[in-house]
Amino acid sequence: LARNACILICCNETHVLGWYVCRYEHSKAWEVLLRRISPPTVVVSDGGTGFQKALKKVWLKAKLQRCLFYAFQQVKRYTTIRPKTIAGCELYGIARDLLTIHTQDHAVKWVQNVMSWKVRHRVFLSEMTVDENGTIRPKHERLIKAENSLVKLINNRCLFTYLDTSLRCTCPATNNRIEGGINAQLRAMLRNHRGMSIERRIKAVFW
């Protein structure tokens, strides 16, 4: 709801399980919402601010699957869809490949590709520059941030939970269920009623 409020939503395959209104997304708000819901076996998240911290505190045994589409989008935000460097083009392609992984072997190969990319371009990534304030900083800072976003997810072991054969349930690789279903309908409704006050918009979402 723009900068005025945020509505956190949890759902399963068929129903909305709960929602919580807050000023902005943060771990305490997620904690309040998660405590209202029975702990699941696995949860899919877009990686919103504070969610993983709340998950570790409230749903101790639940496994986390990070939405692969959001992981790719995070890299794309830094590299753009038309990277201007060879390293950028390669990393964009590696991130895009996330959306095509269907086996453990493919996942292992993908992680190896990320690490190989890092080694292959280590000299390029170590280049420094001086900004307008005279501060020395990495010349390819955005590319490094893109790489770090993937490495962090690899280290957190939350990219390929959907391939875990020990799970007794089906785990999707993305959160399309809530984004393409619930959130898309809510955004469409709010676009069609832009003149409503923030209070009425919140009530409309709840309705």
Where are these regions (language model features)?
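Generic recognition of cysteine residues
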Residues: C6, C10-C11, C22, C67, ...
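RNase H-like nuclease fold core
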Residues: L1-K61
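Acidic/histidine-rich catalytic cores and adjacent linkers
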Residues: T41-G48, Q52, G93-W207
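Short, surface-exposed linear patches
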Residues: V16-G18, A29-L33, P40, Q65-L68, ...
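Alpha-helix boundary/capping residues
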Residues: I37, V58, R82, Q185, ...
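Conserved beta-strand -> loop -> alpha-helix junction used to position metal-binding or nucleic-acid-contacting
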Residues: V42, D46-T49, K53-A95
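Hydrophobic alpha-helical segments
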Residues: N12, L60, K84, H193, ...
